[in-house]
């Protein structure tokens, strides 16, 4: 499961000094918290595992979401102080700031407002927004954040690194390229969620030049006005009709009605 990989559990009994064990355990608890944030957000009540199961325990019952959230938050309050802060943690590892951000997300998603405020107060002011060049081209700044050369930029709270150089690790395309293509497709809902440059959603902004009528946008006749006057981050996130890749015009040849593609599946340096 991509929501709860077992690899976060099975390494818990490696012999090591007590302080190092505490540090690694704290990082693992933060990662487990992130997984349970995802699991409870999608499925609500799920089995809550805090120890290796025997064969007889394999069919674990569900635990109520509220109980999981309370337990996860208490774990984080106890263990986060044992995690190194940004600047002292090794590159690609959990940091206190990232763990507090995870804690804040869980609390926020579950209406635990005081816990969310307390968690985010440990993050605000500890990191800064990414800026490249002279800072005037915000579209380029946003896209540059996701390039390999900036993978340790100050804006990145939790950086996932590959051990490498394994086959396919870190590459934009997998070792095979075939269906289903929906994994790289950006939906029209995602496109339409980006506001116009006046800060208003497309159904309220006078700057929106597209059509809001159902069926107005198709693969054969894309609504090109839909992409004008929009938040620059849209073109830093999605490959849209009219954009260029490696000197070639993208003509929305994906077998999908949205005609948009998630940007990360194109070679970043070429877009």
Features from the language model and the residues they span:
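An aromatic- and glycine-enriched ligand-binding surface/loop that stacks and positions planar moieties
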Residues: 77, 83, 96-255
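Active-site beta-strand/loop architecture of penicillin-binding DD-peptidases
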Residues: 249-271
